[in-house]
């Protein structure tokens, strides 16, 4: 029997032969443009006689293409009969398929529904809900579950629509769906909760069916109440749903808490227990969604219920928090997530009433008071400090077994995945909202942190107390004697603690605490003590400094060094020891996160030390070279090394010339377009390259070898283009022949090609670079290149035809003005060669002067136009009247000194390199200042220049009489009279 070719290729696509798989994928991709192919795929999926793997690959192929093929007027659009076939059998595909296949079919149906409902598929929900109610009525829970999964994915897809018409359709649909789904949700929830409340050991498979049905119904309802109403805060459906979830959340959490408290084995195990936890998380999802998408918790009465039920839950399990991992070994992470979920509820409520107390003062006050009922806030504080913030046995196990991973988990700012950071966040919220109430209990605990811990238990308790004082810095700084504690407790205690375990706990907490209180440490004496402590914590030879202490210190010390209270003198006094300790850390840690942290601290040390890095330059450069060579398989670390190299060059400035060979090797690898990783490193390497050129006094020979790579990147209109232009400028300022002697034509052509690809600031940077090249290069070296390249003719043609926005033409005009000042004949020669109308060019040139914003650029433009008069070209002399008007405009606007300079001629970006900041102490700044002194705008006296041009034109035209007859007769007599007074 002949095998269908599509079936054959699908069978090959799921085979174990990689060659067959690749060949089959090629055939399947080619067939996607053939009419009827996707209809064939769906019929293969629907045929239950086919192998499951075959049906799986068929529906996956359809799912991956549905977004493209279902849109009309595309090359892969479906035939109308294919669309009808898929729509007619879509629900059948969910009903008759196994659960895994049904989910994939649901994804296909959801994407079709998003586009076709209600215009092309008006009966979708009528048919789906009818079959759903029928299956529930007959007790066919497997079919009901598959239909609910399909409905959930349809609602999820439609809820993500952002088009106004689609949103309005969804708003109209949501109440109708909720009316049908809410009874199903209530019935299924009640059924399985009654079974659980019976407290008998449960083995009934029906329980799982009820739980699965309620889970997907709850998912669908959640999307509907959150996204199905334009203003959820004003919807009765949303309010009722949140209240419904609160009631059932209380029941479920109470059951789970009772299981934890009970000495018996849990009555629910395996998949049913996982499903119970899933419901506990889902009941809270609408609460979190309302807070995130449409902040309105203050308007819902059920918010008070959520506070109450989660407070009761935490109170119920507080004494068993240390035993849940043994009790629910396989679901311990889920129990931890429940605790985090409860803490997050409190965090969101506090944040919302803080944000809405001005807009909704009454309801915000109700929420505020809810934490004061039954001494809740003090009980929660006690729970945080004695149960959740305290280090536990499993913490010390992970501290020993996986120190780097443990530090990463503890330092994370993501409160959704770790109990301790979440508890710290809640404590911070309590301090912010109830600071005046909770400060008082902390007064009684102040001197507890002065005591020296004698045992590990005492150290752990003190760790929690100090952590609390760190979190509440803003509210506690007025009552906590930080300086006294540091000098009379912290430093002496560390010296007197002999137990390594106690010392490690104490040092870790001190490192964190100092970074939290650094703002209160403005005195030189305190900062010196703090810096010395951090330096001692980074010493690998001290047995008390294990991986946890060192990694915690690295992150904390970076925060301290970044603070505005930084003391240079105190830092420099321990600088050498710091660098020695930090440089020795790279061999001690292997994880990417740890090495990244060390590199980050090294970069901060370099930035703070600056030129005081000496005499460590060679040692640091050698280490960076070793790291670069040793981490060839770690691109993320190499990228960080590049950033530190940049900070290193910034620190040692001109001395970086000594390491030019090493820097050349790194930069060449990173910017070479043939390098396999140049895309990853290109931007960082460009920044390093430009910074190095900024500080050196002369160009290293090796860096001339990078010019071909520079020219390649000059032709790429990517995000690195500003750096490329900056590097071109730096090369030119270092040696005005190294680029232009051999590459001037190529450079001008590449710059011309970029004109259409760049806009706004990048266009200004490009034109500024061209101006620099023209100013600094001998004209005989670039004359032919300017004449023959497309750049100058392109600029002149745009000005003559006025084909760009005036601000773009101004940038072009400034480039042309630089050329005209140096070689006016070249302008006319290009016009003649390229058939550009000179009269139109000069006319538009003069008109554009009104669009020039800065007086410096107006003077440059006028000097350039005046230079054109020296060509004695009739078309230029014909507009002498307009040019003389510009003369008097310049002369009346600014009062110049004898050299032609004036304060107003200086611009903010005169010393910037293509818009980038330039270090005032850099060699490039010196070079730019010297160039600026030679700029005609600052060195040519306008009055003298205009007079000399006038005299030249008079003499070139046979004296005053002939000049008068030919050209001056068209000039306004008042202008001539005014000019005569200048002579």
Swiss-Prot record:
One of its GO terms (molecular function) is small GTPase binding. The keyword Lipoprotein does not apply. Keywords: mRNA transport, Nucleus, Transport. It comes from the Eukaryota. One of its GO terms (cellular component) is cytosol. It is found in: Nucleus. SUPFAM superfamilies: ARM repeat. Its main location: nucleus. InterPro entries: ARM-like, ARM-type_fold, Exportin-1/Importin-b-like, Importin-beta_N. Residues 24-96 form the Importin N-terminal domain. One of its GO terms (biological process) is protein import into nucleus. The keyword Nucleus applies. PROSITE patterns: IMPORTIN_B_NT. Disulfide bonds: none annotated. Belongs to the importin beta family. Functions as a component of the nuclear pore complex (NPC). NPC components, collectively referred to as nucleoporins (NUPs), can play the role of both NPC structural components and of docking or interaction partners for transiently associated nuclear transport factors. Active directional transport is assured by both, a Phe-Gly (FG) repeat affinity gradient for these transport factors across the NPC and a transport cofactor concentration gradient across the nuclear envelope. Involved in the export of mRNA from the nucleus to the cytoplasm. This is Importin beta-like protein kap113. It comes from Schizosaccharomyces pombe (strain 972 / ATCC 24843) (Fission yeast). The gene is kap113.
């Amino acid at each position: 029997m002949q095998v269908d070719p599509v079936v054959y290729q699908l069978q090959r696509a799921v085979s174990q032969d990689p060659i067959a798989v690749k060949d089959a994928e090629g055939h399947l991709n080619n067939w996607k443009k053939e009419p009827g192919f996707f209809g064939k795929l769906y019929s293969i999926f629907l045929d239950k006689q086919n192998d499951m793997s075959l049906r799986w690959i068929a529906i996956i192929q359809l799912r991956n293409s549905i977004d493209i093929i279902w849109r009309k007027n595309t090359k892969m659009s479906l035939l109308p009969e294919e669309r009808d076939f898929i729509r007619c059998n879509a629900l059948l595909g969910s009903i008759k398929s196994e659960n895994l296949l049904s989910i994939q079919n649901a994804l296909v149906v959801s994407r079709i529904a998003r586009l076709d409902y209600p215009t092309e598929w008006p009966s979708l929900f009528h048919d789906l809900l009818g079959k759903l109610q029928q299956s529930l009525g007959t007790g066919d829970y497997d079919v009901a579950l598959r239909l609910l999964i399909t409905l959930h994915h349809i609602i999820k897809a439609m809820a993500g629509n952002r088009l106004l018409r689609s949103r309005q359709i969804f708003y109209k649909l949501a109440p109708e769906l909720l009316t049908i789904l809410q009874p199903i949700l209530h019935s299924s929830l009640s059924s399985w909760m009654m079974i659980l409340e019976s407290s008998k050991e449960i083995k009934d498979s029906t329980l799982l069916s009820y739980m699965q049905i309620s889970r997907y119904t709850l998912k669908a309802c959640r999307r509907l109440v959150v996204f199905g109403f334009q203003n959820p805060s004003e919807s009765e459906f949303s309010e009722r749903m949140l209240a419904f979830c609160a009631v059932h959340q209380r029941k479920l959490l109470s059951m789970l808490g009772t299981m934890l408290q009970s000495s018996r084995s849990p009555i629910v195990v395996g998949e049913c227990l996982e499903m119970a936890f899933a419901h506990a998380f889902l009941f809270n999802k609408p609460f979190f969604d309302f807070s995130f998408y449409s902040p309105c918790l203050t308007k819902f009465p059920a918010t008070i219920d959520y506070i109450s039920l989660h407070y009761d839950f935490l109170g119920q399990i507080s004494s068993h928090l240390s035993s849940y991992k043994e009790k629910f070994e396989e679901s311990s992470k889920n129990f931890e997530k429940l605790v985090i979920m409860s803490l997050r509820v409190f965090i969101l409520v506090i944040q919302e009433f803080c944000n809405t107390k001005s807009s909704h003062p009454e309801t915000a006050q109700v929420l505020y008071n809810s934490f004061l009922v039954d001494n809740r806030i003090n009980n929660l504080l006690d729970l945080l400090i004695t149960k959740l913030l305290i280090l536990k046995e499993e913490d010390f196990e992970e501290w020993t077994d996986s120190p780097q991973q443990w530090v990463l988990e503890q330092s994370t700012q993501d409160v959704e995945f770790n109990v301790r950071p979440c508890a710290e966040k809640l404590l911070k919220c309590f301090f912010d909202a109830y600071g005046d109430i909770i400060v008082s209990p902390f007064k009684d605990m102040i001197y507890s942190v002065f005591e020296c811990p004698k045992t590990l238990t005492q150290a752990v308790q003190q760790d929690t107390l100090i952590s609390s004082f760190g979190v509440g810095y803003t509210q506690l700084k007025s009552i906590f004697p930080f300086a006294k504690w540091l000098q009379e407790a912290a430093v002496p205690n560390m010296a007197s603690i002999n137990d390594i375990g106690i010392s490690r706990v104490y040092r870790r907490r001190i490192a964190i605490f100092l970074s939290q209180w650094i703002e209160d440490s403005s005195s030189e004496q305190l900062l010196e003590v703090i810096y010395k402590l951090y330096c001692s914590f980074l010493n690998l030879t001290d047995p008390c400094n294990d991986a946890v202490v060192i990694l915690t210190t690295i992150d904390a010390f970076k925060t301290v060094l970044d603070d505005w209270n930084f003391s240079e003198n105190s830092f420099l006094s321990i600088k050498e020891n710091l660098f020695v300790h930090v440089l020795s850390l790279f061999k001690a840690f292997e994880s990417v996160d740890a090495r990244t942290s060390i590199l980050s601290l090294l970069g901060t040390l370099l930035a703070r030390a600056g030129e005081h890095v000496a005499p460590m330059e060679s040692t640091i450069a050698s280490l960076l070279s070793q790291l670069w060579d040793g981490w060839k398989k770690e691109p993320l670390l190499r990228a960080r090394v590049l950033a530190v190299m940049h900070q290193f060059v910034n620190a040692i400035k001109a001395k970086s010339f000594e390491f030019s060979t090493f820097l050349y090797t790194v930069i060449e690898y990173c910017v070479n377009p043939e390098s396999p990783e140049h895309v990853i490193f290109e931007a960082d390497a460009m920044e390093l390259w430009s910074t190095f050129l900024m500080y050196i006094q002369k160009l290293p020979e090796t860096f001339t070898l990078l010019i071909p790579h520079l020219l390649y990147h000059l032709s790429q209109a990517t995000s690195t283009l500003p750096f490329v232009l900056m590097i071109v400028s730096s090369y030119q300022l270092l040696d005005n022949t190294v680029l232009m002697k051999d590459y001037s034509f190529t450079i001008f052509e590449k710059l011309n090609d970029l004109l259409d690809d760049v806009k706004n600031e990048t266009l200004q940077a490009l034109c500024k670079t061209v101006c620099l090249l023209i100013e600094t290069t001998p004209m005989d070296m670039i004359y032919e290149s300017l004449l023959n390249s497309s750049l100058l003719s392109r600029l002149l043609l745009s000005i003559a035809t006025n084909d760009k926005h005036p601000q773009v033409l101004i940038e072009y005009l400034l480039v042309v003005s630089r050329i005209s000042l140096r070689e006016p004949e070249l302008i006319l020669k290009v016009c003649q060669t390229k058939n550009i109308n000179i009269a139109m060019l000069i006319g538009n040139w003069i008109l554009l002067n009104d669009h020039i914003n800065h007086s410096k650029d107006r003077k440059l433009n006028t000097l350039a136009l005046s230079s054109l008069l020296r060509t004695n070209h009739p078309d230029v002399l014909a507009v002498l009247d307009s040019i003389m008007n510009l003369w008097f405009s310049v002369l009346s606007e600014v009062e110049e000194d004898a050299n032609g300079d004036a304060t107003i001629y200086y611009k903010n970006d005169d010393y910037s390199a293509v818009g980038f900041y330039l270090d005032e102490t850099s060699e490039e700044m010196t070079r730019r200042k010297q160039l600026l002194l030679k700029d005609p705008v600052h060195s040519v006296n306008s009055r003298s220049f205009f007079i000399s041009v006038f005299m030249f034109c008079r003499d070139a035209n046979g004296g005053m009489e002939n000049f008068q007859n030919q050209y001056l007769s068209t000039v306004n007599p008042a202008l001539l009279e005014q000019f005569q007074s200048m002579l």
